C-alpha cells in the first residue's frame, strides 16, 4: 500500500531519515562516494522540507519512500529509497509508477549516480532519458 506521509511529524521524519540512511549507505558504497550529501540530511531537514513524501508499506512497516518536488509542468523525483532487505522486490518500481499515475506533469525528472546501475535500469524502463552527466567530487 502506498500512502502520503506527513514529514512534518517527528516520528515520521525520523522514519524517513532511517530509511534514507539504510538505502543511501548502500548507494554510497556502490558509487565509492566518500562524502555523500544524502547521508547528511538531518531530521530537522526532513521536518522543514516542502517536498511530498509517499511511503510503500509492507506489513505495516515502511519499506520504501519516494520524495517528490512538483509544480504544474514538472515533477522531480528528489529521492527514491528502499530498505536494503526489500531490494529487488519491485517496491521502487511501484513507487515510480504511483508517481507517474498521480502527477500529470508534462516533464518528469530524476538524478542518480552514473554507477547506480539498478536505478538507471529502473528509470530507463519508464522511458526516462539521460540528458546530462555531471562530474562531482563525492
Where in the sequence are the language-model features?
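A short helix-loop-beta-strand connector motif used in the catalytic cores of GNAT acetyltransferases and
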Residues: 44-55, 76
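Conserved acetyl-CoA-binding loop-helix of GNAT-fold acetyltransferases
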Residues: 82, 88-101, 121-125
